[in-house]
A protein has these predicted regions:
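Bacterial N-terminal signal peptides that target proteins for export
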Residues: 1-9
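Hydrophobic alpha-helical transmembrane segments of integral membrane proteins
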Residues: 3-4, 15-16, 495-496
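Membrane translocator/pore-forming domains, dominated by Gram-negative outer-membrane beta-barrels
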Residues: 361-642
Length: 642
């Protein structure tokens, strides 16, 4: 009897362990910042500016509360962004991997051909292109493929050109194009060395040029247009160089902030660079120059650099660009789990119909189920969790020689809530299935082929500081599935037990779609955080190997099954494509949420014979040993023979 009880005990153990899963791994294991003061988290706190007087001012400011970065005593966007993924944005001058240093140019700049070129506004600056070279030199020419690289450079290039005057600008119309070319070539070397996730913002410098209500004064129109064009040029040159990067449209985001200040806790005057509270540069701004309240209620510290509130808006936006594609990948993952559940229900009804068959050979059945499904993401990325509901109905016929053929219809619905940031997706699905089964002595087998279609309604909230931009979209999808299952029965008195093996093949297709957001009503576009997503295809081939047992106890027939599942299709290379809707830029791709390749499933239940023609069946199941998923639930059904 111990051999019979073994699968029951194993199944119960798996069910108990099912909710106990480990956390997901991180998408990134390092943060690397490259650029200027927009990213600098404290470079000159630990090294010289190249000017003794400036060094003394920095040292004094640190005593007064300054952090060494360019938000005064506030927090930099790099610190926020890295911390979101459990990483450090410590400056390279203190042993970290944030190479950015305030006042740096993209490349050495000179106003005259052949003239002495400067690395930035400070003699101690290191240009962005040199930062990349220094990084690769320090790593032996190999870039960390699992790092998050943010390359933000160009504001100081714009100021350099602006300071040369109208005549010089007219005489050197392609000057910034040349700088952009050097920038693109440098970032291309970073990618060639192995970097895979590279974010490149355009600029928020445009918001230092706007007046009340976000309107650009006539005196700043040329400078504003130049800043916008420079951002587009850098992206264009990166595309031409074959660099795969994530474009961050800070220009549109901060233009939206400037025109809607109240949404972010600002006033029409406190978003103006001219009204920045600090009388000194952000690098040396202390608590004597700015208050904690002003760091939250003003957009700029000193007219050029963002306060803590502004830095948080930027990091929130950039976080959304990084996490949205993998979050949307779960639109295709939920149907895979639904397909497994659908196949299991139909296979259970095949088993039930085999226990009673009327003189006509026809059985009709109906059933329904409810479960709990949590799909996990990378750490720091949103997970989803919800309650799937399903209902199925079918009819089958047993031919004189024993072959069973049947058809079923299944419908389901679920709302999957996002764990971070708010939002959800509602997924409705329908499927038509054809199935067949046959048993020859102790050996049995069945096959279920299904075609399904899906309707998704997505609501994705993006937090930008105090404001939440609610994006929404609708899309549809389809699936093909083939479930094969076979086994052998060993009869030990009232007990029937034996091995079971299966293979479930699925292809899920989710059509591409574009979001529209709350901010779109003010901008006349889709919105500043709205994205479009490309078509997704999720292929799955899951092998199953296990053992089952049942006991014939009169009208009751309790059963249990435990099996090991293995995903044969490598999911590590699956990516989801996304694109900005607020600006013209190349689409980018991010890895889909990770999927466990091995896990266990346990199920237990019973059938009950109400009469010679009517039987009912109930089953509960759960998964275990899957760090990326929590899945459990139950279903009940009734079968009538004719």
């Amino acid at each position: 009897m111990s051999r019979v009880l073994h699968p029951f005990v194993l199944a119960a153990l798996l069910a108990i362990l099912a909710p106990c899963v480990a956390g997901a791994t991180g998408a990134f294991n390092q943060f690397v910042g490259l650029g200027d003061s927009t990213l600098d988290s404290g470079y000159f706190r630990y090294t010289s500016t190249g000017n003794a007087s400036a060094d003394a001012m920095v040292a004094s400011a640190i005593v007064g509360g300054a952090q060494g970065g360019w938000a005064g005593p506030g927090v930099m966007t790099t610190t926020f962004l890295a911390a979101r993924f459990g990483l450090s944005a410590e400056t390279v001058s203190a042993g970290g991997t944030n190479f950015a240093n305030g006042s740096a140019y993209t490349a050495p700049l000179s106003a005259t051909a052949g003239g002495s070129a400067a690395p930035g506004g400070l003699s101690g600056n290191v240009t962005t292109t040199q930062q990349i070279a220094n990084l690769l030199a320090a790593t032996g020419g190999v870039a960390n493929a699992h790092a998050l690289y943010v390359v933000n450079s160009g504001n100081n290039d714009l100021i350099f050109v602006q300071n040369q005057g109208t005549a010089w600008i007219a005489a050197n119309p392609t000057f910034l194009n040349g700088v952009a070319s050097e920038f693109a070539a440098s970032v291309a070397t970073l990618q060639a060395a192995g970097a895979r996730t590279i974010m490149v913002p355009n600029t928020f410098y445009t918001s230092t040029l706007t007046g009340s209500g976000g309107i650009v004064p006539a005196s700043n129109i040329d400078d504003y247009a130049r800043a916008v064009a420079y951002g587009m040029t850098k992206w264009s040159y990166l595309m031409a160089a074959g660099v795969r990067f994530i474009p961050a449209d800070l220009t549109s985001v901060f233009q939206f902030v400037a025109t809607n200040p109240a949404l972010f806790g600002f006033t029409p005057s406190s978003v103006l660079s001219a009204n920045a509270p600090s009388p000194v540069a952000a690098l040396v701004t202390t608590w004597a120059d700015i208050t904690p309240v002003q760091l939250q209620t003003s957009l700029f510290v000193d007219g050029h650099h963002l306060t803590t509130a502004g830095q948080k808006i930027e990091s929130d936006y950039e976080t959304s660009l990084l996490t949205a594609p993998s979050l949307m990948s779960l639109l295709a993952e939920a149907p895979v789990q639904g397909g497994l559940a659908r196949a299991a229900v139909i296979q259970g009804q095949i088993d039930l119909s085999g226990q009673h068959r009327g003189p006509t050979g026809v059985n009709v059945w109906i059933g329904g189920g409810v479960g709990a499904l949590t799909l996990k993401n990378f750490s720091g990325f949103p997970d989803v969790s919800g309650t799937p509901f399903t209902g199925s109905a079918g009819v089958d016929y047993q031919m004189p020689f024993g072959l069973i053929v049947g058809a079923a219809f299944t419908a389901g619905t679920q709302t999957q809530h996002f764990s971070i940031g708010g939002g959800q997706f509602d997924q409705n699905d329908q499927a038509i299935s054809l199935y067949s089964a046959y048993q020859a002595g102790p050996v049995w087998g069945n096959v279920v082929a299904s075609y399904g279609w899906y309707q998704d309604k997505i609501a994705r909230d993006v937090t930008l500081g105090l404001f939440t931009d609610s994006n929404s979209a609708d899309t549809t999808g389809s699936s093909l599935a083939l479930a094969l299952r076979a086994g052998g029965d060993i009869h030990l008195g009232p007990v029937t037990t034996g091995p079971v093996a299966g293979l479930v093949l699925q292809r899920v297709r989710i059509r591409g779609f574009a979001e529209s957001g709350t901010s779109g009503a003010q901008t006349g576009s889709n919105g500043v955080t709205a994205l479009s997503f490309g078509e997704q295809i999720r292929d799955s081939a899951i092998s199953q190997l296990g053992w089952r047992a049942s006991i014939d106890a009169g009208r009751w027939r309790p059963f249990v099954e435990a099996k090991w599942n293995h995903e044969l299709v490598d999911q590590s290379g699956r990516k989801v494509r996304a694109a900005l809707t607020s600006a013209t830029a190349a689409p980018y791709s991010m890895a889909a949420a990770p999927v466990q390749s091995d896990w266990a499933t346990a199920s237990a239940g019973t059938s009950y014979k109400i009469s010679e023609r009517v039987m009912v069946r109930g089953c509960a199941s759960a998964t275990a040993f899957d760090s990326q998923m929590v899945n459990y639930g139950g279903d009940v059904g009734v079968s009538v023979s004719f």
